[in-house]
Amino acid sequence: THETALKNFSVRHNQEFADAEAKLTWYNRRLYLKTNDGGKIDCNAVVDDLIEGIRMGLIERKRNVPHLKTFATAGEGDYSKASLIGVDYDIEYAQQLAEPHENLRMIINARAVCEARPLARLMDDALDEVCEKYDLDCQVFFTECAPICFRMMMGISRLQALSQQAL
């Protein structure tokens, strides 16, 4: 059954999983958004529109994203964690921001079935559209967009990459 298959599935020492993952592009970005007028806005709408912009960019290019996560913080302890596990799925929220804010710190992490350059462009386009719609200033602190196989060749394992991301 499906449940039995899930219980027996492991990504460790699973060559089929490793081969599939090696074809994906890894994307990471850290950024800061703030309103240009200093007013507070619905930051959940900003996150939603950003993810929808990414989804539409992938659909236009006939690509997909098995893993897209955003983590956004604003104010004291207020945060949002959203996930998209494919362009045909709804956005899932582990947490949404409780109130409007004037600024937002965000991490975008994705593994996508898309070549690196088109993925980077569509991410930039989605962010530009959100900034224009909500009149936001954006400061990007870090962007990484590369095929996972390239990361492996460079000696960066997924665990190393995740630990670097946490720093």
Protein language model regions, located:
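P-loop NTP-binding site
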Residues: T4-L167
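Internal gly/pro-rich beta-alpha loop/helix module
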Residues: T1
